[in-house]
Amino acid sequence: MKYRRQHKSLFCISILGPFYFLLLQCFSTVTASNYAATYNPTDTIALDCGSTGNSTASDGRAWTGDIGSILATLQPLDTTIAARAIRQGPVEGIPYLTARMSSSQFTYTFLVSAGLKFVRLYFYPSWYPGFDRSKALFSVKSGPFTLLSNFRADLVADSLGLEYFVREFCINVEENQLLNLTFSPSPSSSNDSYAFVNGIEIVSMPHNLYYTPAGADGIPFIGQTYFYEIENITALETMYRLDVGGHSISPTGDSGMFRFWSDDNQFFMGGGVIPDKANSTIKYTKETPAYIAPAEVYQTSRSMGPNKTWNMRNNLTWVLPVDLGFRYLVRLHLCETNRAITQVSDRQFIIYIDGEMVDEAADAIIWSGGNSIPAYRDYLAMIGFEGTQGKYNLSIDLHSRAGFSVYVDAVLNGIEIFKLNSTTGSLAGPNPEPPKTIFLNEPSQLTIKGSSNKKTTFIAVGVIVTVGLVLLSLRLYTMFRRQRESKDHGYKLKFTETKASLLPWEVCLQFSKAETKEVTHV
């Protein structure tokens, strides 16, 4: 990592905006169509763990089984097994139908070209023959980086309310270097832990997609006076990739790298009108080529609406839980598609990240150079102190800039957040707390035979319903108390009418910004 001191000239952009805009118009001699092509990755590996031969997923993508595959070697082979889940939930099929499992360490080795790669690990934490769902406890390492540690896939899936999920990382591979992924069961008191994986995907990415290009200043470090360079010796973990105001975009709908974009509904806390979908043709540029984000991200957005009085009192707000003790790359995507907005200062607004003002005059026309031209801005945030544990609600707030803007409004198209590895090379965060619900046993133990068990069944159902009502009452009480407490402090509620969050991470330990500063003295 490298640091560069921030230059004061950056803060003059709002003053020099009109001149900056004219310069962009004068010197933009290359048409946007030259940059509209999707990215063609050098390496595209999709390994269906625990299966053999070639298969096609529901989205049309080809997957190769790891048994006898030329794409990867598996060592040691004799201590692992290929398994199919005892109970197949509502999964999409490949690569979740089979898994590679072992009670001892195993390593996949991939021969790939040098450069930065997406590494995606697919998990379907179910019951497999001889393996208890709750006993999967393991770590995953790649070179000097710890991607996962003491990882409980079942807790992650349950906290998300999902049957299956993907973890995505960004890792650099040096020249003449192999890419290794080592899965190691964690020690447990019962000595019956195991590691598993359902699928592994490796896709090349452009060298400057998320990393600082050579010779560039880096990105603003929030709360500091210097820039931060993200070098290729850094590993990243994708925390969020959101199509703001839109819907989820499948990997095949991405611009060449098979990234998944989620909608922002779960994380948007209010302050905006109905999401907007524009019919504009997105004009990609050298600074923002098509591989940065698909056109659909820039065609959808959230804005505040036409009520100036209401807009002056409120924010557009997103709250995204992250792990304490790490640095985060926060990327905001912006594209002005309102045909009435074509000039500098037509729509300017203030951006806050984690309560800190990072841009006092954000303007899509200044950022990009014109209407329907996409742009993005990166910021670095340090959340807590390295070594601290728990969850933290990272906030992004946009507030209108009344008196300096024709439209008293704010707008945003997309959000991406990435975790940077710690000084020890770790990206691993804590597991979610076990959900406060009643889990059924392994399917083979669920059978109830004979009429003599009917009374037992009715009693069990009654107990479950009663416990559920008690937990619901406690949940509603907690929400009500939090809402009352939140009115007494915090800059966000000065402008924003928020709605209660039902995020699964709320069962984890969370701290406010003030509490974090008090503990860490930062």
Q: In which residue ranges do the predicted regions lie?
A:
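Compositionally biased, intrinsically disordered or flexible polar/acidic segments
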Residues: 2-521
